[in-house]
Amino acid sequence: MKGRPMEKVRAIVASLIALAAATPALADQAPSAPAPVAAEDAAPQEAIDEAIAFAKEMTADATVALTSTGTSEAEKLKAFQKVLAEGLALDVIGRFMLGDNRKTMSEEQIALYDAVFPDYITRLYADQFADIVGKPLEVLEARALGAKDVIVRTQFPRNDGGPIMVDWRVRKLKDGSQKMIDIIVSGISIMLVKREEFSAFIAQNGVDALLARLEKEAEA
């Protein structure tokens, strides 16, 4: 891996923050992202407790990946990407970001997008975790969002300034597994920001140009 991965991730997310200034959080908009499978029926409190436990587990795993000793920055990023790849509903997120554009793509274009998307999106989330790893997670509230999802609102202390607010949108799949379909830090949802950005980019430059850009940024 070339360059300094985490610095490049921070530069990318800095531009996202500027783009997202006027974008409401996903927890408030609650878009209906397509789900590959139906959610299990569960008692509301049981589903909420499971979602809280999953958010805590994912945070702990991310902390281990990003703070391990004796590993390079690139190795830490790779370990963190593995945590996210296992915890995120990448298919749901990837489809949501493409929106209706996916319907016009060829099988080859979809295959390339699906191949490069995991590396691309986990790099963007990596910077959001940089400010919360190793800090205690405090659950403020959790609530059901529709029939399938739970929003877990948490905060992490910051050395200077107020706490960092993080909303975790968790979905329980039919097979019983828990998956994150969005992580919203300080009110900014990469899922929503990138959906708008992808749509505008494709309209101006075409699908192939977007795929080339994602490949380049995933390997940066």
Language-model region placement:
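Early exported N-terminus immediately downstream of N-terminal targeting peptides
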Residues: P36, E40-Y125
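Solvent-exposed loop/turn segments at secondary-structure junctions
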Residues: R102, D119-Y120, A144-L145, R158-N159, ...
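Surface-exposed, charged secondary-structure patches
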Residues: R123-I164, E217-A220
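Short beta-strand edge/turn micro-motifs at domain boundaries
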Residues: P163-L192
